[in-house]
Amino acid sequence: MSTDLRDLYQEIILKHSRKPKNSGTIDNADGEANGNNPLCGDRIGVYVKLDGDRIADAKFDARGCAISVASASMMTELLIGKTIDEAKTESSRFIDLLTSKDPPEVADDDELAALLGVRQFPARIKCATLPWQTLAAAMYGSETEVTTE
């Protein structure tokens, strides 16, 4: 990876962590769940409003590291407007990007590619995947808190 691309990815993560998109809660959400990463101290709530089988709105309320907040911000931007099945596919794809020995291809201009550097730091993978795991719990109506441990 070139230095310019690495710098761009770092800039994307910082942008999303400093001014996260879709931060907040949704009153009368169709799905909501809480997540916790005890090792890093990340805590997140994810809220989903559906219109039929489509995600009409998604928000998160997070207290955590830059990686966790940036991942949640990118996640909500990507998934609003998608069907539940598309969201499940995107969630699986993202988690595979960070955890699979043979990750799927990702375009350099895909904002999620900014989080690929996390692969080098196994403890930080949990920071990046926590929002996505919490989203899955929100969509499935799980009342159990998601935890990375």
Model-derived features with residue positions:
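Functionally engaged cysteine thiol sites
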Residues: 40, 65, 127
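Alpha-helical macromolecular-interaction surfaces
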Residues: 69-70, 89
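Short, thiol/selenol-centered motifs that function as redox-active sites or metal-ligating centers
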Residues: 62-69
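Alpha-helical support elements that line or immediately flank enzyme active sites
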Residues: 71-83
